[in-house]
Amino acid sequence: MDGIKKKMIAMKLEKENAMERAVQYEELLKKKEEEREKRESEIAELNTKMKQAQIDCDEVQETLQEQMNKLEETDKRATNAEAEVAAMTRRIRLLEEDLEVSSSRLTETLTKLEEASKTAEESERGRKDLEIRSIADDERLNQLEDQQKEAKYIAEDADRKYDEAARKLAIAEVDFKRAEARLEAAESKIVELEEELRVIGNNMKALEISEQESAQREESYEETIRDLTERLKAAEQRATEAERQVSKLQNEVDHLEDDLLAEKERYKALSGELDQTFAELTGY
């Protein structure tokens, strides 16, 4: 009887110990389950972060593509601007050549004008000489007339001298008319040269204005090129910053993937512990 009683007490103690272990295992199982749910929640949160990181990465890639397109467009504009500057440079060079030709023509015209002025001065001196000769002939004619009045006996000689004086006077008048014609031609030539000089002066002023406008356009093109260069540098900086952001996001994605892999390993280990716990409970 004592043996049965002891055995029953031992069985009762063993039952109590088993119940206590069952309670402990249930609490342990509950903790493991809570930990598993927590890990699953963390994994879900990590998946959400990974999706958001992927979305951010896609947006950054789109932004990078847009920046690359803008950079390409900026390069095209810069190329076009350089072509325009080259064209303006060629045009300025041609204008400079035209200006040199015009200057040469102006020099030739001034030389011709100076020669015409000298010719006009010579014609004026000739005209004055003719006038002096004409006055002298008139005085001589008067003298002959006085001599004719004073000495009729030498009338024939006086008539001859008179005829000679008249002939010289006619020659002088013809020379005078020729001198006047040459003077008028010289004056007309001077007027023509002055008109040509005025036209050349106007052309030179027009060339100077065109050159100033070309210089202004060239300055505008240089300013545009500087602006495009600054915009290109800004685009390159933005592209570099975008690449840095992409690299940073890629590192974050890599870290998240590593964390996810570690969580999966922990979840796998936790599942193994739970399976082992269930096996131990089932064994009891």
Curated annotation (Swiss-Prot):
Keyword Coiled coil: yes
Recorded superkingdom: Eukaryota
InterPro entries hit by this protein: Tropomyosin
Keywords, ordered alphabetically: Coiled coil, Repeat
Residue segments, region Disordered: 111-131
Pfam families (UniProt xref): Tropomyosin
Coiled-coil residue windows: 1-284
Family as reported in the entry's similarity comment: Belongs to the tropomyosin family.
Record text about domains: The molecule is in a coiled coil structure that is formed by 2 polypeptide chains. The sequence exhibits a prominent seven-residues periodicity.
Oligomeric form and interacting partners: Homodimer.
Entry function: Tropomyosin, in association with the troponin complex, plays a central role in the calcium dependent regulation of muscle contraction.
Name of the molecule in the record: Tropomyosin
Lineage: Eukaryota, Metazoa, Spiralia, Lophotrochozoa, Platyhelminthes
